[in-house]
Amino acid sequence: MNPDNYLYLAALIFTIGAAGVMLRRNAIVVFMSVELMLNAANLAFVTFARMHGNLDGQVIAFFTMVVAATEVVVGLGIIMTIFRTRRSASVDDADVLKF
């Protein structure tokens, strides 16, 4: 398969994720959209690594997955805290974490 197809797919997935971040108000949907954007970047990194025959893109993708895993833990913890206090997972309710 042509590497251009993988890059087009990565661009499409990134665009869907960016649209989800900009258009949705639910914190969980925004969170999933950010994860889509990170996975699209990983696909592009791995595609470029495959095209050039080195492992740099795969190493970057691995570290991005590690960061995304920690982001899931912290992000879901924050979303659950907002939900417990406001009974809503809306992005507009994030001001509850202010002092």
UniProtKB/Swiss-Prot annotation:
Highest taxon listed in the record's lineage: Bacteria
Topology with respect to the bilayer: Multi-pass membrane protein
UniProt-recorded Gene Ontology molecular function terms: NADH:ubiquinone reductase (non-electrogenic) activity; quinone binding
Enzyme class: translocase
Gene3D superfamilies: 1.10.287.3510
Catalytic activity, EC: 7.1.1.-
TM spans (from-to): 3-23, 28-48, 59-79
Task performed by this protein: NDH-1 shuttles electrons from NADH, via FMN and iron-sulfur (Fe-S) centers, to quinones in the respiratory chain. The immediate electron acceptor for the enzyme in this species is believed to be a menaquinone. Couples the redox reaction to proton translocation (for every two electrons transferred, four hydrogen ions are translocated across the cytoplasmic membrane), and thus conserves the redox energy in a proton gradient.
The protein's name: NADH-quinone oxidoreductase subunit K
Lineage, highest ranks first: Bacteria, Bacillati, Actinomycetota, Actinomycetes, Mycobacteriales
Gene: nuoK
